[in-house]
Structures are given as structure tokens and as C-alpha cells.
């Protein structure tokens, strides 16, 4: 792997964590968060929901199976990638490993370097995660080039994750259509940073997907594309910045259109319902998060990546469908009278367990009932 120079993670409270730099030689700012996922770093790094964030991995061994080729595809979308490029601002790990896997095309170090993303290894990530868990997520910078760290700290304290619209940075500028071999339905996806894993699950079920930009009128698109339903995707950032989007979603409620939301999509459906959103102290990010379905009484393990949640008492026309068994936060909602469902977690996983792929089947049943 060669000789790696020193690098630093600087936090808004003045803490400076020293490590060894890998990836690109640069400076990147972001909200510092962590994931407890043991595997799936290519999926995590390319997840658009991480835009604007520096990601810490609690699992100490990263890079063990390298980075696979994008030529491995399903429904025309590359496997093990959740978008076309790395979306995190930086990656902080404990050990940078030499890969040994048949599908590996390059090392983690090479991949980050190619995409201009800095990394830091040789860090006690579990101690760092304990700090964030106790004090909450905070702004920071990953520095892998020579610079004045005092100046970096000043810059950190000027940035605001809460007031930045990251969705517009990851949403497409024009519509994108994905067509399966046997089309049963057509769904308009309000693309706020949709994961490829979600698209793959929709396409597997015979759903033609029309991805539209975040600031388009969802109802107008639904009718112009002669769609059967609407899907509100995951995405990065503060949901309360997207109140105009929530208003447009609210208009679609009046048409009784089948709808489904995931992650940010659930939060926007709740905002459209007049509910309140709050920020979690350190978020839910990992692939082993327990969730309970209040209707069936069943529990399952899920993949999660969110920093905000719904205030359950503030829901009006929706009811709580699922809850997180760690902190009882809202993980799923259903409309009381309209064909609308949503989850806060990611039923497609990617990476993670497939315990809740059935949620997509529930959406298909709703579409079938309205056909």
C-alpha cells in the first residue's frame, strides 16, 4: 500500500484526531456520523443519503474485499453500488486492508483516490464513535494535505449541515426511465437521491420507473407519464428544508394515488400530513437495527441510514405502522384511509438483511388493487 502521510479529522469542539491519509489528498467538510455495518462499504460510500457527511466505520477491518467492477449488473444497474459515484465527503477507518476477492477491481485506497475523496486510517474508531454517541453528531473536516488546522477549525464552525439542501446535489436534472423486461406498472419516483437497490427491487417486480428531479411537480408528472403510483425516495439532509416538496406531495393526497416512501420519503409524507420532525442525537446507521411491525407483531432486522425521525404524537391522518425496538422511534407509517405506506428504514437493505423485502410486495398489492 506504500507509505501514507499523516492525516487529520478535526471536529467542531476543537478535537484533532490524527491518523494516516489514504485516498485523495484534499480537505473535505461535513457532518461526522458513524455506521455499525460490518460489511457493505461500497454500498455505504455510494449511498446518496450520506452526501454532506464524513462517515466513520465501527468495524475495524475495511477494504478486505476491495471494490468490484461496475460491469456486474442487475436490471442494468451495477451491483454493490448505490449510485454512480462516492457520495460521502470522507471515510474514517481503523485498519486499511489488502483486498483478496475474485470480483475486486481495485483497492479501497485506489477507489477513493480516483474519485477525489479523502480517507483516514489508523484511528481508534470505536473510541471516536463513543464520543459522538455521548456528545451527538458534530461538524468536522477530514484533512489529508498540509494546511493550517486552526484555519480549518474556523471554517468548520462556519458551515451548517442543517441549512444546506443536499438533495439538489444528488437529484437528477432530467427524467430517467428504467424499464424491466415485463412491465406491469409504471411508477413516478421523486428522486431525492434514490439508491440503486430500491430501483432494483421495483424493477424486479415489473415496475417501470420514471425518476424525476426533486423540484418537479409530482402530481403533474404522475398524470403526464400516465403512471400507476408515486414513490418518494430516500435522500440526504434536513427534511424541513423541503417544505415546498411536502406541499406538492400533499396535493397528491387528494387524488388517492398509491404511494410509497422510504427514509426521507417517509419524513416528507409525514410533513405533508402536518407532522413534526426531530433530529436524532447520533442517528441510526447500520445493518442490524431491530424493527417491530405493530400489525403482525413480528420483528425483523433492518438496514438504516437516517438522522431524523417523526414525532409520533404529531401524526394526523397517518398511523404508526412500525417502531424501532432500540428507542421506540417511528420506523413505518400507513395512511388511515388512503393507499399510502412508508418506512423509515431501508427494506431493500443493500447492504444488509433481506428480512423486509416484503414491503415492496405490499406496494405491489396496493398498485394491483388500483389497476
Swiss-Prot record:
The keyword Nucleotide-binding applies. Residues 1-182 are annotated as: CPSase. Small subunit of the glutamine-dependent carbamoyl phosphate synthetase (CPSase). CPSase catalyzes the formation of carbamoyl phosphate from the ammonia moiety of glutamine, carbonate, and phosphate donated by ATP, constituting the first step of 2 biosynthetic pathways, one leading to arginine and/or urea and the other to pyrimidine nucleotides. The small subunit (glutamine amidotransferase) binds and cleaves glutamine to supply the large subunit with the substrate ammonia. The gene is carA. PROSITE patterns: GATASE_TYPE_1 (PS51273). InterPro entries: Anth_synth/Amidotransfase, CarbamoylP_synth_ssu, CarbamoylP_synth_ssu_N, CarbP_synth_ssu_N_sf, Class_I_gatase-like, CPSase_GATase1, GATASE. Belongs to the CarA family. It is an enzyme of class 6 (ligase). It comes from Pyrococcus furiosus (strain ATCC 43587 / DSM 3638 / JCM 8422 / Vc1). This is Carbamoyl phosphate synthase small chain.
